[in-house]
UniProtKB/Swiss-Prot annotation:
Organism listed in the record: Staphylococcus carnosus (strain TM300)
PANTHER family with a match to the protein in the record: L-2-HYDROXYCARBOXYLATE DEHYDROGENASE (NAD(P)(+)), L-LACTATE DEHYDROGENASE
A GO MF label: L-lactate dehydrogenase activity
Protein name: Malate dehydrogenase
Keyword NAD set for record: yes
GO biological process, one term: lactate metabolic process
Record NCBIfam families: MalateDH_bact (TIGR01763), PRK06223.1 (NF004863)
Positions that bind NAD(+): G10, A11, G12, H13, T14, G15, N98, L121, T122, N123
Keyword annotations of the record: NAD, Oxidoreductase, Tricarboxylic acid cycle
Gene that this polypeptide is encoded by: mdh
Length: 311
């Protein structure tokens, strides 16, 4: 039986951390692809990961390269490549720069890994997922964006800190766009099976929700240079594992909507079942009154999407 293969486009902090997790957990062989001028660092990171194998007890194959031919046969392609917003750069400038990156990357994927599933991480991730979906021509179930698992993990972490309980005992879902309008579902938030509202006052819950929405910015502020990469890489790993192992996990993911939740022609974070085909199903759940903010979140994503050339 052939071993699974995951190609990661972009060998920065998130891409290389993801490569390490995949190799260490023996999920798949990894191709870490960079632009030609950054090929040597990609090769160095790949070699460094391989050299940790004898110590940690894994035998993964990790290749650093700048040649798209090396992604041939990949089961999953993860896109982490793209520019970060710099001082003086408008939102529309960033969107157009990264849309151009998505166009270049998607051409390589279409040529060398046409049967792959694509997971997008590049920001603004909802809009970039939409761009990749349109540019690739792939079926909608094979183009996903990562945000909900990460946002939910942050939410669960902050709840666990407030209650001084195990993070793994907190369950919940965060839907919508990846930003200030994301929607933590309070009706689904449980701590060891107990509803969160029975354990925390509303003002404390509101503070947790706000901190979750600013979770990425909090990390950026603490780091001083760069952004989060451990948790984002872990979130992508969870998605990739669910697909390659056909786990049929119910997790939040960005996917193209065609009527679900009343939305059309938009990529948005919603509950999905992930399995061998990618998004096996979008799960539509009843939202309480305070969760109707999903409409506001979709409007914010539409506003960002309006700056795309391919729409």
């Amino acid at each position: 039986m052939a071993k699974n293969k995951i190609a990661i486009i972009g060998a920065g902090h998130t891409g290389s951390t993801l490569a390490f997790i995949i190799a260490e957990r023996a999920l798949a062989d990894v191709v870490l692809l960079e632009i030609p001028k950054n090929e040597k660092p990609a090769r160095g990171k790949a070699l460094d990961i391989k050299e940790s194998g004898p110590i940690l007890g894994f035998n993964g194959n990790v290749l650093g390269t700048s040649d798209y031919q090396d992604i041939a046969g990949a089961d999953i392609v993860v896109i982490t490549a793209g520019a970060a917003r710099k001082p003086g750069m408008s939102r529309d400038d960033l969107i157009q720069i990264n849309e151009n990156v998505m166009a270049q990357v998607t051409e390589g994927i279409k040529k060398y890994a046409p049967e792959s599933k694509i997971i997008v991480l590049t920001n603004p991730v909802d809009a970039m997922t939409y761009a990749v979906y349109k540019l690739s021509g792939f079926p909608k179930e094979r183009v996903l964006g990562q945000s909900g698992i990460l946002d939910t993990a942050r939410y669960r972490t902050f709840v666990s800190e407030a209650l001084n309980v195990a993070q793994t005992d907190v369950t919940g879902l965060v839907l919508g766009g990846h930003g200030d309008t994301m929607v933590p579902l309070l009706s689904t938030t449980m701590v060891g099976g107990v509803p969160l509202r029975e354990l925390l006052a509303q003002d404390k819950i509101d503070a947790i929700v706000e901190r979750t929405r600013k979770g990425g910015a909090e990390i950026v502020g603490l780091l001083g240079n760069g952004s989060a990469y451990y948790a984002p890489a872990a979130a992508i790993y969870e998605m990739a594992a669910a697909i390659l192992n056909d786990e049929r996990r119910l997790v939040p993911a960005i996917t193209y909507l065609d009527g679900e939740y009343g939305f059309k022609d938009i990529c948005l974070g919603v509950p999905t079942i992930l399995g061998a085909n990618g998004v096996e199903k979008v799960v539509e759940i009843e939202l309480s009154d305070d969760e109707q903010q999903l409409r506001d979140s979709a409007d914010a994503v539409e506003d960002v999407k309006s700056a795309l050339k391919n729409k």
